Design a protein with these regions (language model features):
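C-terminal non-catalytic regions of proteins with extracellular/luminal or membrane-system context
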Residues: 1-223
């Protein structure tokens, strides 16, 4: 599908209460190393109070009809993030990816906003969240492992034949990690908010669970 228009952070940021001192491309989307782009971004990061770093997987890294052979984001993006973190500790990462990725670099980000596959108007939506105009209320719909080797699929992919082997049985997703006591990067259902919530009057019945949910913060939010 071809979008009618595409908003970018660079285009939209002037509409928000952010004093932007500049933008830099930083890396090639196709994964090639480019020291000129990297140096330009690092120099700009050194001058900034806060860095908003947009990174993730492009349409060539994940797509219908093919399986990824690893869970890493392109190395040139990681190297840029690590280089900027050496000159500026206030990095807000805005991640775009349609599925779980390894995050050995997560400590380089003081905050991390996951946009998944945001679409043509995602830049404005991300800036709404970053500036507090909107409250992030999303929760991870999948577990983010520390590394690919920690996943139950690691031993059986790729298959030697044209078969996909599913050996998890009942232990799909978080059930596997909980049962096997495997440490994860971010658990299923993880997500932060600009407000806080209180659970009370918990009642467990044969048909389900009921409780009273109260927003105890100063901002509207969903839980």
């Amino acid at each position: 599908m071809n979008p009618t228009k595409v908003e970018t952070m660079e285009q939209m940021i002037s509409s928000y209460p952010i004093q932007c001192i500049g933008t830099a491309k930083g890396y090639q989307r196709t994964g090639e190393a480019d020291e000129v782009l990297k140096k330009e971004a690092v120099n700009l990061a050194e001058k900034a109070d806060v860095v908003i770093y947009c990174f993730g997987l492009d349409e060539l890294s994940e797509s219908e009809g093919l399986d990824r052979t690893h869970m890493r984001i392109p190395q040139n993006q990681v190297e840029l993030l690590e280089a900027m973190a050496k000159v500026n500790s206030n990095i807000v990462g805005v991640l775009s990816a349609g599925s779980a990725v390894e995050m050995p670099w997560h400590s380089c980000c003081k905050a991390l906003l996951h946009g998944y596959l945001g679409g043509q108007a995602s830049a404005g939506a991300m800036l709404d969240v970053l500036t507090g105009k909107a409250n992030p209320s999303g929760r991870l719909s999948e577990t983010y492992p520390v590394r690919y080797e920690d996943t139950p699929a690691f031993k059986y992919f790729p298959s030697t034949e044209r078969n996909s082997e599913y050996r998890e049985s009942l232990f799909v997703g978080y059930r596997y990690y909980d049962t096997s006591k495997v440490r994860v990067q971010y658990p299923f259902g993880y997500g932060l908010s600009y407000t806080s919530f209180e659970y009370s009057d918990l009642r467990v019945t044969a048909d389900g669970v009921e409780f009273v949910l109260t927003n105890t913060g100063k901002m509207d939010g969903a839980e």
